[in-house]
């Protein structure tokens, strides 16, 4: 009993410490909540939330599992200097609410494909972090004409 209790307390402390390491920019960032540039697109049965920053060649940023637009707070302004940055809350993440009972990488990659169609973007560059990388890779595999890099 004592070992389990100590193990549980240790796990709580470690997890709490990990979350406290997020830079303040993530906690106080406008990204993911910017009403001036935030929009919803009706994509495959749900409303997909996205924000667009900058001008130039399109670049879509795809966050990882459990993440949101806010996870790219440190990168958006940098890339927006030279690109039209499209940051998206993936299906069932952030402001993109989906109450469906299934979720897959293929499903999410097709969501991004449809969003690009909705935005009339013929091709773009992709940066994906963690599971966002998987989604970007599948998007490139299934729709190679839409992905530059």
Question: What are these language model-derived features?
Answer:
Residues 6, 60, 76-80, 102-105, ...:
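Glycine-rich, phosphate-binding/catalytic loops in enzymes
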Residues 46-95:
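Conserved HGGG/HGGXW glycine-rich cap/lid loop of the alpha/beta-hydrolase fold
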Residues 87-128:
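Active-site loop/oxyanion-hole signature of alpha/beta-hydrolase fold enzymes
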Residues 2-59, 82-83:
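Alpha/beta-hydrolase fold catalytic core
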Residues 122-149:
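Conserved hydrolase catalytic core segment
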């Amino acid at each position: 009993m004592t070992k389990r209790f100590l193990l549980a307390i240790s796990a709580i402390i470690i997890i709490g410490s990990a979350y406290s390491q997020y830079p303040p920019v993530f906690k106080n960032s406008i990204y993911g909540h910017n009403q001036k540039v935030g929009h919803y697109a009706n994509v495959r049965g749900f409303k997909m939330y996205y924000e667009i920053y900058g001008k130039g060649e399109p670049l879509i940023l795809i966050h990882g599992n459990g993440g949101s637009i806010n996870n790219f707070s440190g990168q958006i302004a940098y890339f927006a200097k030279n690109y039209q940055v499209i940051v998206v809350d993936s299906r069932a993440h952030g402001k993109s609410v989906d109450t469906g009972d299934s979720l897959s990488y293929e499903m999410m990659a097709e969501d991004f494909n449809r969003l690009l169609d909705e935005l009339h973007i013929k091709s773009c560059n992709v940066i994906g972090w963690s599971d966002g990388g998987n989604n970007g890779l599948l998007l490139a595999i299934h729709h190679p004409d839409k992905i530059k890099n």
